[in-house]
């Protein structure tokens, strides 16, 4: 298919898989916990740079005061150290699940518990400022999944009620919802992207055409100009086909067995399920897991 960019991306994916296998073989519990804490601390640096970036945006637009208004144009949305605002938002979702995990696993350490709460609210604030609307649903769903698998049913119920309250607030005050004026037009764009992806899948259902297939077929099927199919359910099929995805079945099965062996460690299983929740919920409207970073 002359998909040179896709071939290079496949090499990058292979390198990432090698690193993942090495990590799984050598990491221990203390290293794992250190990595989680390191990511949480790094999120503070992301936020600091993101706030600086936001004030740079204000300066460029001639705004001389802080405002909660989130601008629609990509260049006027903060992305911190990531490729764009949506990538940053998804990293915040993962960090939020990590923070909830650490909050419930830290024992008899009030200072650390307060630290996790403060960093959690900082990241929620930054999520709002990214303007990524799918992020709100993904982070709520992922945290609820974590709490269910961690057997914190009452807290999950209370958070669900809180989410309903937030939904009610935005229903009564739609102007407060980030980029509300572009909601319908953005959904129309998504529909155009998905229709193009579906036609591409039908054209090559078994093997796909490799990473970045969407960029190769968008003109042929009158798609919207973008890098991918904006769906974790469509882009893998478009790029790798049914056979390509079937190759993941043994890996998924092996990981399910690994999880079953540690079923008594509720928090660890809850962390994994929270991550899966982020991917599957955010992935309805976007495909930010493609990139190695």
Predicted regions span which residues?
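Membrane-interface helix caps and helix-loop-helix hairpins in membrane proteins
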Residues: 1-5, 128-129, 178, 284-290
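Membrane-anchoring hydrophobic segments
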Residues: 1-22
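Alpha-helical transmembrane segments of multi-pass inner-membrane proteins
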Residues: 12-16, 33-66, 72, 80-149, ...
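A membrane-periplasm/extracellular boundary helix in multi-pass inner-membrane enzymes
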Residues: 33, 48-57, 130, 147-187, ...
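A conserved mid-to-late transmembrane alpha helix and its immediate loop/hinge
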Residues: 80, 124, 195, 224-259, ...
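Long extracytoplasmic/lumenal interhelical loops at the membrane interface
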Residues: 176, 181-195, 199-203, 207-240
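Membrane helix-loop boundary segments at the extracytoplasmic
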Residues: 240, 270-293
């Amino acid at each position: 298919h002359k998909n040179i960019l896709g071939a290079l991306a496949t090499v990058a994916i292979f390198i990432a898989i090698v690193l993942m296998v090495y990590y799984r073989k050598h990491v221990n519990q203390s290293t794992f916990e250190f990595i989680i804490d390191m990511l949480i601390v790094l999120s503070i640096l992301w936020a600091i740079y993101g706030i600086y970036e936001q004030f740079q945006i204000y300066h460029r637009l001639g705004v001389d005061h802080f405002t909660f208004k989130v601008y629609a144009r990509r260049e006027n949305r903060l992305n911190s150290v990531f490729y764009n605002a949506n990538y940053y938002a998804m990293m915040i979702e993962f960090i939020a699940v990590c923070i909830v995990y650490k909050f419930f696993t830290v024992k008899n350490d009030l200072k650390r518990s307060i630290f996790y709460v403060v960093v959690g609210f900082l990241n929620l604030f930054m999520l709002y400022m990214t303007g990524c609307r799918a992020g709100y649903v993904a982070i709520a769903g992922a945290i609820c999944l974590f709490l269910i698998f961690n057997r914190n049913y009452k807290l999950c119920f209370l958070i669900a009620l809180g989410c309903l309250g937030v939904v009610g607030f935005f229903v009564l005050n739609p102007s407060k919802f980030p980029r509300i004026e572009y909601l319908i037009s953005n959904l129309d764009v998504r529909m155009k992207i998905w229709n193009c992806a579906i036609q591409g899948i039908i054209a090559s259902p078994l093997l796909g055409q490799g990473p970045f297939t969407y960029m190769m077929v968008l003109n042929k099927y009158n798609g919207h100009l973008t890098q991918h199919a904006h769906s974790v359910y469509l882009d893998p099929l478009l790029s790798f086909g049914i056979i390509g995805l079937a190759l993941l079945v043994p890996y998924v099965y092996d990981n399910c067995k690994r999880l079953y062996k540690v079923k008594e460690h509720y928090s660890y299983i809850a962390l994994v399920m929270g991550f899966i929740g982020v991917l599957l919920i955010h992935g309805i409207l976007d495909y930010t897991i493609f990139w190695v970073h």
